[in-house]
Design a protein with these regions (language model features):
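Phosphate-binding loop of NTP-binding sites
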Residues: 5-190, 197-199, 203, 320
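Adenine nucleotide phosphate-binding catalytic loops in nucleotide-utilizing enzymes
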Residues: 187-294
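Low-acidity, Ser/Thr- and Arg-rich intrinsically disordered low-complexity segments
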Residues: 291-298, 302-309, 316-319
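Generic structural signal for hydrophobic core residues of well-folded globular domains
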Residues: 102, 269-272, 313
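N-terminal Lys/Arg-rich, disordered targeting/topogenic segments
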Residues: 1-3
């Protein structure tokens, strides 16, 4: 994509800031690179994201692993060159992290992005993704309940606005809030991730009534919202498809939850035109990526120093020093 002069200059200065941050021992420089770029070129996010073929992955849990799976699956495709794919699978998933990743590969025509829940609507509106993977909404803190409902509404509105130009959504059929948001998409591929999200799914996101749960899934008897029939589902260590195909996952990443993540990634890769067997070859090479807890502990240690360094760096630019 052709970048504006302002953005090219901002990216160059962002790279200098990242190098200076590393030399000063303030972290990897990824965060400050994106922050400096956005500070100097406020339109960097839409300008960098819009010209590409985007696949985005979001959810409270599992998005880093699923992004790794999907990236490996697409890398294994015979139709896409490795240098033509950029990803932020290190977990830097807010605006600055996405800008930082995309700015390092401005010529790559394909992007596979891990996206924080708060950034999804912007990605849909400004990036026009080809595929959007919606994993789950987990109310891991009581005060997040209202926030998640608001975000679900925001996703739904963005998908409604996108209409037929919007993404194919690969969505977790077992999560009522995900289903309610994803129903607004012009095309949805439903994945039953098995265990049911009953602990997080008491009230209907559409009408507020109490949801009923049984062996067939969940449903609301007041408004009719219910768990949709799955196009893909997990059975033991296999990904099952509605058309009768079965795929042995044989992934290296431990944990039953990651079988669901792998199935979502496989469904998304298939929607992107990747042969499922090629996708699986790539996915089986994925080892356990850095989990969110590890990244959080590192971020806590460097965030304050990084922000202070950013302020000093921008101040020096403004003053000409």
């Amino acid at each position: 994509p052709s970048l504006s002069f302002r953005l090219r200059a901002a990216l160059m200065i962002g790279r200098l800031a990242a190098s200076a941050s590393r030399l000063a021992g303030k972290g990897s420089g990824s965060s400050i690179r994106g922050k400096v770029t956005l500070a100097l070129a406020p339109q960097a996010f839409p300008e960098l994201i819009a010209p590409r073929q985007i696949a985005a992955v979001t959810g409270t849990n599992g998005k880093t692993t699923t992004t790794h799976f999907l990236t490996a699956a697409v890398h294994a495709s015979r139709g896409i060159e490795p240098d033509d794919i950029v990803t932020n699978a290190d977990g830097a998933n807010l605006h600055a992290g996405i800008v930082s990743a995309l700015g390092q590969a401005p010529e790559a025509r394909n992007a596979i992005l891990e996206v924080d829940e708060r950034v999804v609507a912007d990605v849909v509106r400004q990036g026009h993704p080809r595929v959007l993977v919606l994993l789950n909404f987990s109310r891991d803190q009581l005060d997040r309940n209202h926030e998640l409902t608001f975000l679900g509404r925001e996703w739904r509105e963005a998908l409604e606005e996108a209409g037929e130009e919007g993404p194919t959504v690969v969505a977790n059929a077992a999560d009522p809030l995900i289903v309610w948001a994803a129903q607004a998409a012009h095309r949805t591929v439903w994945v039953d991730t098995k265990p049911r999200w009953t602990a997080d799914s008491v009230l209907c996101p559409q009408c507020g009534s109490i949801l009923l749960h049984d062996d067939n899934g969940w449903r609301c008897e007041e408004c009719g919202l219910h768990q949709p029939e799955a196009d893909w589902w997990v059975d033991d260590r296999k990904a099952m498809r509605k058309d009768g195909h079965e795929y042995e996952l044989e992934i290296s990443v431990p944990g039953s939850f990651n079988l669901a993540n792998a199935t979502c990634a496989l469904a998304a890769a298939t929607e992107m035109g990747v042969d499922p067997y090629d996708a699986l070859l790539g996915m089986r090479e994925v080892s356990s990526p850095a989990c969110s807890a590890n990244m959080v502990s590192s971020a806590i240690e460097t965030a304050k120093a990084t922000d202070e360094f950013l302020m000093m760096f921008i101040a020096s630019l403004v003053s000409g020093g």
